[in-house]
């Protein structure tokens, strides 16, 4: 099994601004290790003679002419919001510690 450490799980949680109990950290450590083991199994697949494909759906890039369209009326929008501050819509804080997200 891949060696994913609890410290690595805690580090990813910190970067993701998530908090886990010690039991959750242990569980995620085992689960992530199993996932990485399954992905590493792909290295063993013999792909000789299999043509390279970038997009199996065979879609093409569909381009259209870029046309400017009238947006929302700012005054009507601002009149409809419950809270505003300095000309912006004020929403509840998402990060409890005021982080850099």
UniProtKB/Swiss-Prot annotation:
Annotated Pfam families: GatC
EC numbers: 6.3.5.-
Gene3D superfamilies: Glu-tRNAGln amidotransferase C subunit, N-terminal domain
Gene Ontology terms describing biological process: glutaminyl-tRNAGln biosynthesis via transamidation; regulation of translational fidelity; translation
GO molecular function list: asparaginyl-tRNA synthase (glutamine-hydrolyzing) activity; ATP binding; glutaminyl-tRNA synthase (glutamine-hydrolyzing) activity
Top enzyme category: ligase
Catalysed reactions, semicolon-separated: L-glutamyl-tRNA(Gln) + L-glutamine + ATP + H2O = L-glutaminyl-tRNA(Gln) + L-glutamate + ADP + phosphate + H(+); L-aspartyl-tRNA(Asn) + L-glutamine + ATP + H2O = L-asparaginyl-tRNA(Asn) + L-glutamate + ADP + phosphate + 2 H(+)
This protein's record includes keyword Ligase: yes
InterPro entries named among the record's database cross-references: Asp/Glu-ADT_sf_sub_c, GatC
Domain of life: Bacteria
Keyword Cell inner membrane: no
PANTHER family (alphabetical): GLUTAMYL-TRNA(GLN) AMIDOTRANSFERASE SUBUNIT C, MITOCHONDRIAL
Family to which this protein belongs: Belongs to the GatC family.
NCBIfam families cross-referenced by the UniProt entry: gatC
Subunit field text: Heterotrimer of A, B and C subunits.
HAMAP family listed in its UniProt record: GatC
Functional note: Allows the formation of correctly charged Asn-tRNA(Asn) or Gln-tRNA(Gln) through the transamidation of misacylated Asp-tRNA(Asn) or Glu-tRNA(Gln) in organisms which lack either or both of asparaginyl-tRNA or glutaminyl-tRNA synthetases. The reaction takes place in the presence of glutamine and ATP through an activated phospho-Asp-tRNA(Asn) or phospho-Glu-tRNA(Gln).
Descriptive protein name: Aspartyl/glutamyl-tRNA(Asn/Gln) amidotransferase subunit C
Organism: Lactococcus lactis subsp. cremoris (strain MG1363)
